[in-house]
Amino acid sequence: MGQKWKLYIVKDGKVIRKNKFCPRCGPGVFMADHGDRWACGRCGYTEWKKK
């Protein structure tokens, strides 16, 4: 916890998110990238990536 700064990058003077937000929990709750899926650690929502 407390390391949300690692989930942002600055490119061409703009701040860009590396991971996406959870559609259930809303802005501020990031989903974890597990390679084959995106998962929310708060509510458990999972999106599978397409091959």
UniProtKB/Swiss-Prot annotation:
GO terms assigned for molecular function: structural constituent of ribosome; zinc ion binding
UniProt entry keywords in alphabetical sequence: Metal-binding, Ribonucleoprotein, Ribosomal protein, Zinc, Zinc-finger
Gene3D superfamilies on file: 6.20.50.180
InterPro entries: Ribosomal_eS31, Ribosomal_eS31_arc, Ribosomal_zn-bd
Cofactors, names only: Zn(2+)
SUPFAM superfamilies: Zn-binding ribosomal proteins (SSF57829)
Superkingdom of source: Archaea
Subunit structure, interactors included: Part of the 30S ribosomal subunit.
Protein name (Swiss-Prot/TrEMBL): Small ribosomal subunit protein eS31
Lineage, opening ranks: Archaea, Methanobacteriati, Methanobacteriota, Thermococci, Thermococcales
Gene (UniProt): rps27ae
